[in-house]
Each structure stands twice: as C-alpha cells, then as structure tokens.
Curated annotation (Swiss-Prot):
NAD(+) binds at D57, G58, N125, E126, R150, N227. The keyword Kinase applies. It is an enzyme of class 2 (transferase). InterPro entries: ATP-NAD_kinase_N, ATP-NAD_kinase_PpnK-typ_C, NAD/diacylglycerol_kinase_sf, NADK. It comes from Ureaplasma parvum serovar 3 (strain ATCC 700970). This is NAD kinase. Keywords: ATP-binding, Cytoplasm, Kinase, NAD, NADP, Nucleotide-binding, Transferase. Its main location: cytoplasm. Involved in the regulation of the intracellular balance of NAD and NADP, and is a key enzyme in the biosynthesis of NADP. Catalyzes specifically the phosphorylation on 2'-hydroxyl of the adenosine moiety of NAD to yield NADP. Belongs to the NAD kinase family. It is found in: Cytoplasm.
C-alpha cells in the first residue's frame, strides 16, 4: 500500500553523548517518531527540517548563535537545570502533535553587535560590557545623544535572555513573544555632580544603540552570551541592534510554558 503521509526530515544533536547513551534517548526518540501516524519522519543529517537538540541552555545558545541563518525548526529536550529554551524535559513527554504545529515555532530575536564597525557578533541572550574599575560610555539612541554613563558596565539582553544576568541586576523580565530588547546599567556612579538614569530601559526591536568615547583604566571585557571576546585593537565604538533569526525555536512563544518555567526556577510558594 502506498504511503500518502507527509514526509518530514529531521536530525538529532546530542551535546552530552554519555548522558544520551545512558538514557538510550536517541533510540527512544527515533522509535517514537517511527510510530507516529500523521507524518513519516525520516532522518536526514544534510538537510533536516527539524533538529532535536538534547542538552542544556548553554549548548542550545551556542548552537543558535552559530546556526541562526539556517531555515530550520529546533526542538529542545532539556539535559540541564533551568531549560528555558527546551520544550520538554524528557523523550517521554514529547508531544508530536505539538512538534508538527507551525504555530508552536517562533523566530527568536538576536542582538547584532558591531565593534569598531568591523567585528560583528550575534547573541541569543546577552551582551555584557564590564570592568572591575570605572568605565564610561557616551550612549546614543538612534543617533540621538542619550546620556553619559559611568559605572561598572552595561547589559544588553533579548527577551529570552532577560532571566539571566539582567534579572540579577534587577532588570525587567520580558516574555519571549514581545519583540523588545533591554539595556541595564551595572553599578552606575551616582553622586551630587553626576548621575545616569539608573534604571533599565526597554527598546523597540528597530532601535539602534551606539556607545562611543569608551574610557576605562586597565581592564574592560566584552562577553557575547558568556564568551569573552578579546581585541588587540582599541575599542572606539560599539553598536547594538536586533535581527530576527531564520531558525525557529519550538515553544518559545508559549506563555503558559514560560510561566511554568518562571515558577519552577525562581518563584516559591507556601
């Protein structure tokens, strides 16, 4: 009998091979896909439509930062602690009806960072600019002067990154289906002669932030999603804007699951 079911090509990436082997998760997932009645799933490493990522948030972030230009759907199965980018905590809990639902996928917002107008970086979570001593920036919003900041540094975060360092710095949490980004000041200097706004600012996704006249004494670090970027040249200016990834993340726009993760990770009841 001819198989008239639609075909979906997929692949599986496991970032913790020993854990995958111990759980037998790859075999369990492949078996689950084979038994699904509505679609024929075929593994295709060269050109998958769906990629199942087995790992923690760190592995997920690194993967997206490298593969964001590819038009592929990504489903996360959590092997870490928080699992903010994962839709499921185990193979057993995977709902294949949700996997094939186009409405369950969302193109995440990324930060596009340019340094000295020649070095370009992309981050799913956050850009951290930090110094153990005093650092100062002239900040412009859409090429209009905003303020001169003096303090330990600045954080720029996407909605999906707002529960990280930004939360620790008392920045706002933004739900993933809101297309904004945040600038949060880190330990700003405030006294009688000088003070900055000393409050997080939420920007629309089409805003562009420029940092110029960057001054610091000895050390100044630039971190893209936790990865320190080293520069041999002097940093004269930094520009931050956003782009939409071509890749789609499963469940990222599901506010009910997001609230459940917030409760599980941060909120304690009686």
């Amino acid at each position: 009998m001819k198989n008239n079911k639609p075909i979906c090509f997929y692949d599986i990436y496991c970032f913790k091979p020993q854990e995958c082997f111990k759980r037998n998760d790859i075999n369990l997932l492949e078996d689950k896909l084979k038994r699904y009645s509505k679609i024929t799933f075929l593994r295709n490493k060269e050109n998958p439509e769906i990629i199942f990522l087995l790992g923690g948030d760190g592995s997920f972030i690194n993967f997206i930062n490298q593969q964001w230009k590819k038009n592929v759907k990504i489903v996360g199965i959590n092997y870490g602690q928080l699992g903010f980018y994962s839709s499921y905590d185990s193979i057993k809990t995977i709902n294949l009806d949700e996997i094939i639902d186009e409405n369950m996928y969302y193109n995440p917002l990324l930060l596009k960072v340019s340094i000295n107008n020649q070095n370009f970086f992309y981050c799913l979570n956050e850009l951290s600019l930090f110094s153990n001593e005093l650092v100062s920036f002239d900040i412009s919003i859409n090429d209009y002067p905003y303020e001169k900041f003096r303090g330990s540094g600045l954080l720029f975060v996407t909605p999906s990154g707002s529960t990280g360092k930004n939360k620790t710095a008392f920045g706002p949490i933004i739900f993933n289906n809101h297309e904004n980004f945040i600038m949060t000041e880190i330990f700003p200097v405030n006294h009688l002669k000088y003070s900055s706004l000393n409050a997080p600012v939420v920007f629309r996704k089409d805003y562009k932030i420029s940092l110029t006249n960057i001054k610091f004494k000895k050390s100044f670090s630039v971190a893209i999603d936790g990865n320190i970027i080293n520069f041999s040249d002097k940093i004269n200016d930094i520009k931050v804007e956003t782009i939409q990834a071509s890749s789609k993340i499963h469940g990222l726009n599901n506010f009910k699951k997001y609230i459940d993760k917030l409760n599980k990770s941060f909120i304690k009841g009686e």
